[in-house]
Amino acid sequence: MKPIQLENYFEEQNWNWGEYFKFAFVRNPWASCVSKWEYRKRIMNNPTKRQKENGFHDKSKNAIRSWKSFEGMIRQGLAGISTSPQYLWVFGKDSEQLVDFVGKCENLQEDFNIICDKIGIPRQQLPHANKTKHKHYTEYYNDETRQIVAEKYAKDIEYFGYAFGE
């Protein structure tokens, strides 16, 4: 749920939005695209996992099946998968930040610790689930695909301080 939707829900419930600590996590857009590609490969190369993709919409299934290469996925406009820029989940209509803290997946444990400290709960070690082994995300890109992602996610890159290769 987007923060603006939550804010509206709080208002309907007569809860004070300002009394709560709100946070979101974002991910490097280039790394995120590689993750989507690697997920596609796992699904399409594993009949058991392919059976479990029933939760996907038909449009997503068809898009995933149509990708023959990482470059193809990027060039096709990342069609049919969840590709909304992340800033839409963090900022409101007037570019005001709707959450109190934005963590980065690249710093997950450290940023989670900040959240624990802020809300007054003991720090905990997060489990590392769904880890995949693949090359560093920068090795998937050429100049063209790097630029396509940079243009699509320009505001994410700007607002959250991302740069290719960092």
Regions found by a protein language model. Give the residues of each.
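Membrane-interface amphipathic segments in extracytoplasmic regions
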Residues: 1-166
